[in-house]
Amino acid sequence: MRLYQSIATSSLVISGVYAQSRYAANTVPVYDEPEAVAANFPNPGVELYSPAFLFPDSVPDEFANGTSGPTSQALLEGFLQGLADRNSWMTYNTPNFTSEEGRSIPYVWLSNTEGFNGTSSDKLRIYVHGAVHGNEPGGDQAVMAFLGKLDNNATWAEEVLERADFLIIPRYNPDGVAYFQRYFATGFDPNRDHVKLARRQTLDIKAMNVAWDAHVSVDCHEYGARPLVNNTLLSAQDGQFSAFKNMNTHPRIRALAEGLFRDEIAAAMDANNLTHGPYVVIPSQSPLRLNEFITDNNGEDQIALSQGISYLSETRGIGLADSHFARRTLAGLTIIEAVVQTAVDNAEEVLTLIEDARAEYATTDAEIIITSMPNVTNMTWPFISIANGSTLEVPVIFGNNSPAITNLTRPRPEAYVFSGAWSEVASKLRATGVEVEVLEDGFEGEVEALNITVANLATIKFEGVAQTTGIETEMSLRNVTFPAGAYWVSSRQRRAAHAFVRLEPEAESSFAVWNVLPVAVGDEYPVYRVPRKAK
């Protein structure tokens, strides 16, 4: 059977695989699809207004062998500048920072407000980026195709910009694109750096994102088209998409994302004869198990945890070189356009609901959700047979995270308090927009202290960190005293969810997991929970 009422769509990722890294040499092997498989993905025959299709002679030969993308940095910059020169509603910008190797990261504002300079307006704010991973060319090409479509249809552009303003970064990771690799130039994965915030480039782009303060966002990727289950099956979806699912996002925002937005994206994909399904990871191939992706540790969570609607777009493309590129770009464009169109068609409802939910989130006494698990069921899932190209409904064990089952909750504290010695923790929280107060008179009072009872050290380093996993704690009440300069993080703020997922040690991507706050069995966790009404 097919589940769509309770599932979202995106990419197939095989967990537990750690690739070896070399500087500027991390391309992936190209998969040469059998003709019977390729027949499932015909050219859509539509006009696309992005550089690879407007200027086909500019596409390098290396795109065909999977060692380059289709659009150079210079052409991307020229394309964006050209659009801005002929459209008063687009402003081309170069930030005051660069990539790790000094490449420009151009971005554009879209607004019909005269003299718009990126400051907040009373309209819906939308954020879009592509090419977080440099070997996923369908991402930035889809973003540029969206801009090109606006340029080519003045009536549509006017309708969209009457109700929304945009910040768009087509190419988040220009170093990765230059080497056609997933990673930053340093070998860090950009989409695994949103919690630990180890790279300056991540912090710089996040600062733009915090300042923009979007209500709706789209993060544009491609997923791997590799054989599965003893080289018998391939993923079948042109595009997979998923709303960011952390349970600490306001339930009304999650309901809107998983209801109206999801349904409209699915309808748009159907209208373009594109296959689609939820974004899943594959923790096991024997038996075949799929889990809906939870993006706490593996994606840009800025908008969702700031109480907004955030969608992940994944098109079938990694390892396919230039195969089906028009179809891949169309799939990505369709998802972007559907999110945008749904937002602007329902702008008043979306804006009001999100702003109201943000205000409620800052004042609620609801419990916080620290960990969750999927609702596991047996079902079938469509795959393509490598043997003959037919689509098969394959039995799978499916982990449904829409919504997930909560398995660890905790009362919302009045605040977290910790020593001024942990300035790095305060800095990383502030980078996400969380307000962190410095207590000039220090702190003395009763707190909830967490004693570490279980903490497992990973046997493999990930990006230089041997993570501490499976953390368990016991809580007790005690009095603590901190001198002047201690930090106070109130839970009465609408970005508090960023603090929850980082400061509660058991959370999947907490600072304790990343050893930003190192812990071992027997330690008292150095961040204390102040019970409500204690200040």
Whereabouts are the PLM-identified features?
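Bacterial N-terminal signal peptides
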Residues: 10-12
